[in-house]
Amino acid sequence: MSYRVQVRVMPRGGLLDPQGQAVEHALSALGFPDASAVRVGRAIELEVAAESRREAEARVRQMCDKLLANPVTEDYLLEVGES
Amino acid sequence: MLTVAVVRFPGSNCDVDALRAVERVGVMAQFVWHRDTSLHGADIVILPGGFSYGDYLRSGAIARFSPVMQAVQRHAADGGPVLGICNGFQILCEAHLLPGALLRNAGLAFVSKPVDVVVERTATAFTSVFEPGVRLRLPVAHGDGRFVAAEDTLRMLEAEGRVVLRYVPATEESPLQPNPNGSANHIAGISNATGTVVGLMPHPERVADPLLGVPDGLGFFTSLAAWRPPVSTLSTPNP
């Protein structure tokens, strides 16, 4: 089976996110002062061959822990779908 | 005789400056390509500045897995000195040879200018010639230089005296100056517990030549030249 996995990597809450702040300021300047708490992260999509959905998720978690996210500064969320 | 390996990643751009700074203090230096699996017998490693692998994913994240880094990991584990400058510091953090991480500058802008730093830890392979507390003016040039670490890691670094360089404390008038990037505790450089692995955001190799003004960076290289391996780790006796 091949699974399509979406990984969302976000700066850890509480850490200064200057990109999020800059985007928030820009939104406000463009007439969207109602936008707040903007944070900028990264989305990664990949396909992974695995026997089961659970195995696919476990493999991608390993990938996140090793490379896709920095455990010191980032958190990640996975969404596993069939491809 | 000491030899130094300057590692070249695709995107390194301070490699020649680093090599010349080493040669200036009379130590042999050679380039080692990122695909090499050995350091060719070098005693000391420098990971130079630049934008290895285009800074893809995170600065230093891809370089960490290049073949040569396996050799650098073994070298460091055996007590061999490693100096990471700028992108090299980012690589050392990604490789977990140093704690913490270097994130986008708090002001978002790429910062390229001289900054004043204080040398705190002198018990390292790269700062042994300095007097503790001496102030240096060194150039920085980075977009991702904001040092962050978990609270307990920061406490540990401070308690163990592992801050090697610190930006001169900020003033009320300019809360981000001269700390150019918002680093925690104004940290500009740290070391491992034994002082053999050092990471610096400023570029000493760019001010190691008297032709370019006051050579405040030269001491890092004269320290390196004075480093000697502990006798117990010598595996091949000299003839």
Predicted regions and their residues:
Chain B
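N-terminal beta1-alpha1 cap of cysteine-dependent amidohydrolase-like domains
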Residues: 1-84, 93-99, 103-110, 118, ...
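Glycine-rich nucleotide phosphate-binding loop and flanking beta-alpha elements
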Residues: 52-53, 89-91, 147, 171
